[in-house]
Amino acid sequence: MSVILRGVVVGALGAGIGWANPYIPGEPVKLVFKDFASEFLDYHCLECHDEATKKGDLSLEDLGPVDETNAALWKSIWAQVSLKEMPPKKKEQPKAVERLPFLDWIVGELKRVMKDKGGFQAHLDPQKGNFLDHDLLFGELPDGIELAKPASPKRIWRVTPQEHITRLNELINTEPKYDPEKPGVRTRGDTVPTNHGGELKLYFGADRIIKWQGGTVAYATSVKSVPVVLSSTRKHGFENYPNFHTVNSAEATQILGKAEDIIRYMAYGPLSIANPEQITDDPATYEKVRPKGDLRGLPTALVYSTKVKRPLTPVYELMKASKLTEELLLKAVNYVFEAVTFRPPTDKELEQYLLVTSEAIERVGKEDGVVIGLSAIFLDRDALFRSELGVSGKPSKDGRVMLQDWELGLAVNHALSYIKPDEQLRQSIVDGRMRTRVDVKREVTRMLADESFRKPRVLRFFRDYFDYDLGGYICKDDKALAATGVPGRGSNHYRAMFDATASTDRLIELILEEDKEVLKELLTTQKVVATRNDSKYFGRLKTKEERNAAIAAQKKADKLAKEKAAAELENLKEKLAALDAKIKAAKDGQTKKSLDREKKQLEGAKKRVQNIVKRGAGTKGDPALKEAEISGPKIFARVSHRSFGNGSMKPERTLTTVPEGERMGILTHPSWLVSHSDAMDNHAILRGRWIRERLLGGGIPDIPITVDAMLPDQPNTTLRSRMRVTRDTYCWTCHEKMDPLGLPFEMFNHAGLHRTTELGKPVDPSGVIVDSGDPKLDGPVENALDLIKKLSESERVEQVFIRHAFRYWMGRNETLNDALVLQEAYQVYRKSGGSMQALIASLVTSDAFLYRR
């Protein structure tokens, strides 16, 4: 482009993109390609991407307005310009007042063009949240930009799978009240935990089973359980955004079927899933009448206690009554509706479901009719979605409307809880005291301060943020796993990972109880919550010299044990010979019987000693592994109902510390390390991407479909060496931001064990922070601990944490209009000494949470 033409374009950009009036982010850009986007491309892009230059084999010279044929290219332009990858850093950069309208124009055009072709929602994707420039959010607002008052869009928000199954669990199981003497034990209001196999299931009557036939697998197949219905992709990061989840027809059909099971259990308890003779406090009575043969794995293999443990509700009263009355039916409909929607029905809704149930009773009789009618309520919109439409408020001049009454009350409840509002919050809603910011502040402060009020949504934030709960779902190669130093066969490893998730949950809760410098503590704590089997996972692989010394010590111990056993064997032989003589001489039967018992004991001892002489002492322990010492106060972690017989998960845990210099914080715990690994090895790229996105606030564009994103298969080569292919010029632009941040974690293997050598050579855990956005952070790091320490002390890292908290509690990506909300939340977090409670209160009382547009 000529200098003269560039001058003309600059003038056009100044008039067009600079706007006659201040630019308001998010407002529709009502300009056409020729007069606007084309000029931006001419000035900022064509110098490198015209037909003559064509850098990266890409020409934009003939690119026209957005249409379905070039939508992919425009999406790529949007990503590159958003991340400031283009124009390159050495080139003149567009001002914010030029770049932001250009990006808004692309988004608007892609939404318009792709409306009937699957739509365009990339800008709403939680993984694209960092595409918004961090410095714009926390720095001074550039000239020419004016912010609109914050508000979230009107929406209906599907409940999460965890929230849905916890709602249903409330109908059929009575969870214990909070016990301050046993914090950590599963309590009413806690989320339903996954079971021993990582499945999220609803169990019927598990708390009443007192006997079963068979072992662990037989129990698991005998007990009545139903899996979670609502779909959710089990992947890294936040996923609970309203834009990305709905309820399909298959799910609706399943919900209806499960609703019938639930209604019947509410009415009849185990009688709905078992025969009357199975319900007894004396299992021997069932043994006399049970079906003959092998019942393992069948529902008839179970025996239930007669003690009623489920909630006895109006549904029970309705079905128990010999005569159907309108009052009983009314109470049952009211109860079920509020139980699954968290609010009382309107007169119209009540009339509708009474009619449905009454007609069903007329057609098929009372029992089946009640089940059919009440099951329909489980498919009510508000049983599956939470509406935030601002139906009660009055819109202001700027188009915003504040949530009020039930909409606001349920939004506040959802911010912390999975079960319906407690009595105080419900009464506030009914009394009209959930209409102002002060009302919200009052209720949120109360609930946050009350330990007995369970807050599973807070814990879920940390699961989604850290992604430490995925380790049990990564299918490991048995041989590769065995080489790490942990059991490589059977389900032991996967059970250990699901236990590790529960343990990490508990550690986070302990840090939240202290509520001081929460993020820094999570990143740097030396504390761990562990089971007794975690000594291997928190252990360290020995050096070659240490292994040789351990093997030599084992051999020496075996030799000494054999020598001692040989001497003991001779002694036992002499004793047995003498005893044989006594037995022969014994005349009365009682004496002989006593001597025979003594001989049997000596022969058992002789056999044990002979085994030691033959095979050695069988010294316990892996000579290649130094196991961690698990000692400290006994505590509890939250686990599922009995799901695997006697092999079910146990809540008992130990609060201990890790060896200094080996680990630091959650990012060095096996739960996080394995969650960021693959079947065969570590996943340094995934770990580095996590650091880049979750702590540094950087963004990574999507991998082009033409890229074969595979490392070479070289089993006897270190991961660092195999990752050399990512240093190719085409790859390194993105991998430079990830690889050097993930490779410091090579001081651990893919089962999470600490190591100093790999394939017989010293491990290289060095790395480097580049282009972090904070010059004080950039530079080399020695290993993962050095990296974590630097990051934990960074102001930028805390601000990025605030951004992620915003996304989670608002259910959307932040926009530039949310800048003041984010800045205020950060100041509150800092002034409170890093309090999570203060941060949540700030976010939940912000305009972005309270208002809809």
Model-predicted segments: where are they?
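Long, ordered, helix-rich scaffold segments
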Residues: Y241, L271-K323, L384-L410, H414-S417, ...
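Aromatic- and Gly/Pro-enriched helix-to-coil junctions and flexible linker segments
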Residues: G18-T285, V289-G297, A301-R310, Y335-A339, ...
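Secretory-pathway/luminal and periplasmic proteins that interact with or process carbohydrate-rich
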Residues: K55, P87-P88, R112, R343-D347, ...
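Bacterial N-terminal signal peptides
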Residues: R6-G16
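Short coil/turn segments at secondary-structure boundaries
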Residues: K89-Q93, D116-H123, E277-I279, T346-E351, ...
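Extracytoplasmic c-type cytochrome modules immediately beyond a signal peptide or single-pass transmembrane anchor
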Residues: W19-N21, F33-K34, W74, L83, ...
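Sequence context surrounding c-type heme c attachment/ligation sites in exported
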Residues: A20-S76, Q80-P101, L330, L579, ...
